[in-house]
Swiss-Prot record:
Record lineage: Eukaryota, Fungi, Dikarya, Ascomycota, Saccharomycotina
Residues with the Phosphoserine modification: S84, S104, S107, S115, S144, S203, S215, S290, S397, S575, S707
Name of this protein: Target of rapamycin complex 1 subunit TCO89
Location in the cell: Cell membrane; Vacuole membrane
Annotated Acidic residues bias: 157-170
Biased composition (Basic and acidic residues): 147-156, 213-224, 244-253, 332-346
PANTHER family listed in its UniProt record: THAP DOMAIN PROTEIN 11, THAP DOMAIN-CONTAINING PROTEIN 11
Membrane topology type: Peripheral membrane protein
Miscellaneous notes: Present with 243 molecules/cell in log phase SD medium.
Organism (species): Saccharomyces cerevisiae (strain ATCC 204508 / S288c) (Baker's yeast)
Functional summary from the UniProt entry: Component of TORC1, which regulates multiple cellular processes to control cell growth in response to environmental signals. Nutrient limitation and environmental stress signals cause inactivation of TORC1. Active TORC1 positively controls ribosome biogenesis via control of rRNA, ribosomal protein and tRNA gene expression, and rRNA processing. TORC1 positively controls protein biosynthesis by regulation of mRNA stability, translation initiation factor activity, and high-affinity amino acid permeases that serve to provide amino acids for use by the translation machinery.
Amino acid sequence: MVHRGRTLKSDTDVTSLNASTVSHQSKPFRQFSTRSRAKSNASFKGLRRVLTHDGTLDNDYFNKHNVSQKCKSSDALFRKRTISGLNMTALTRVKSNQGKRSASFHSPVHNTLLSPKNSSHSNTGTAGFGLKPRRSKSTQSVLSLRDAQESKKSESTTDEEVECFSEDNIEDGKVNNDKVIAEHVMPEEKKNVQQLNQNELQSPDSIDEQEEDKSGTDGKENHRAVSLPLPHLSSNNYFGESSHSIEHQKDGETSPSSIETKLNATSVINEEGQSKVTKEADIDDLSSHSQNLRASLVKAGDNISEAPYDKEKKILDVGNTLAAHKSNQKPSHSDEQFDQEDHIDAPRSNSSRKSDSSFMSLRRQSSKQHKLLNEEEDLIKPDDISSAGTKDIEGHSLLENYAPNMILSQSTGVERRFENSSSIQNSLGNEIHDSGEHMASGDTFNELDDGKLRKSKKNGGRSQLGQNIPNSQSTFPTIANIGSKDNNVPQHNFSTSISSLTNNLRRAAPESFHGSRMNNIFHKKGNQNLLLRSNDLNKNSAAPASPLSNEHITSSTNSGSDANRQSNSGAKFNSFAQFLKSDGIDAESRTQRKLWLQRENSIMDLSSQNDGSDSIFMAGNIDAKREFERISHEYSNVKRFYNPLDEALLRVQPIITGNANNIRKKSHNDAQSIAHSSSDTDHKDEDDLLFTNYDKKFDDLYPHLASAKIQAVLSGIWKSESYLFNKDVNPINKNRTTSTNHSVGHTASQNARNLLRGPMGSSTTLHHQRVINSLQPTTRAVNRRMENVGYMHTQPQQR
């Protein structure tokens, strides 16, 4: 047994081992030791000596040396360099195991790279594991993993696992495949029993991924390998050394339980030269030898509880029976292609109990469910049930005749049932259901047990819809029961055509809450909805029955007497404009109210009088409206500077008046001085004070008088310009004199206003023009619409 950090060879063994290989004599002897227990991913201590020129084993190696002797570390390092190129090529997939496992798991090099610790392996006497060339049909390996065997006398089994191999026949020799099974004994395997309980029904297809995931994480377990045996393993010594495989079994048991764990999916196609008698003899030798070894292991102090393994054995037996049943029904395709490629064999891994069953009793959860679904679908679809693609006597597809009586909302989960029997008959009912057979097939759907249907819906989570096919009544309970057990069973019975979906969505159950509520909402607006229903009924009376018309008929019949009373009131709505105003004819709509709010910021009319000369500028004229908006903007800009100018004039006015008063005072004083040479200073001062107060009061009133004069001038200009504008635009007023009376001027202004809209003075424009004295505001959009209407009325008269 190889122990870490030290070698147990003597000097004579080392010299004899060096002398057996010529290619290694030139390499200097180097022996190193370390006591570090760190896991190494590049340990090659267990590799056998090979000859690199022809890829065959050194046969003298087994003769000169005992199998239990250990190879030194320098040879392992040399072999590492020798097989480095082969290790690179071993990381690819082979055709025989596409989608199953990588070929790198078959190589001994990869196994040693994956090994967390350098545990020993049982060794075979005559055969090894490795690359088997297909061309020469050689039974020898290019590479073989030398397993440093633990002798039966050794008592240290705590750090090392025990591995052995067995080869048996499965189920009375029906399949003659050589099996190599690795059973492992380690204390850490107790924690794997719970994991086996969870994965006991999995298929052997998914154990590859489980081994790949666990190979990099479990530090206490040995390297991983896929057990692929060699064709000829008939040595009694081989089976004698491989007796560790059933040390967990009881004394009265033999190896058939372990034989059941082997499946055809992971076995290699054997060569036909194997004899059945030799195998049975080997099995007997194996069973007797395993009991002796089991007793020796228990004496060695390897305290391993047998209860978990007994429980695990039962679990594996259940999985083995399922897998064996599967292998008998479906032959493995990987075995047929296996010998087409060169592959690398490796011994069994020492990882866990899950790998003991060798990808046979465990499988992925998803694949298990998929296989179970396939088996259940086989039960669901017997031979007497016609498929979805079958057609009846007349050549119509059976799915076209099917209309379900329920709908399941995928977003809310609400189920809506359509109890009306007429909803099942679609537009093809009159043509297809002529014979009694088709009607009977339709009646079988209606006569199904609703209790079973609801129970299956609650358990399965989706509605189970029956097919409109023969014998659907006898097969539907099976579908419902399976759907209640497994909610992942895909049901493709629901018709996915656009017409059927539309019909199903439009069908509302009067008994359901949602359907009754929607019917009440529709019948509240009886004016417009009853009009549509009455029109549809009149149109569909002569036409053939369609799903849409049937729904209108059923909905109208379910509406009640209130809807029938209101049917006469809806007859007066014969135009689309009145239909829009069905809620209230005189009431303003929301859009109209928004327009009124928008018009509040628009410019109001100038005055409420229409008999003046300026009536042309009222809101009825679009051009006048635009001109007024332009002038109003200019006037508002001028008005901004009114207050600053007024204040500036008020500041300047006292200065001007003060200078005038001073001049007048000087002239007055000169006259007084000439007339009165005497001194009258007191009286002059009083007069000056009196005039100054009067001047100030006059100056205060002067700006208001000036503004009044300005307003009078502006109003005169406005009136004169309005009269000139009215005279220039109206061609009739050119021949008239200005001495006309007030009535003539009023009629002229009316004609001028009409001519702005229509050049020929048509009276039709007056009808479409707004009332001038109304104070309702307008917008440009309203005025343009009115102008366009008047323009369209005047166009035929111009032609």
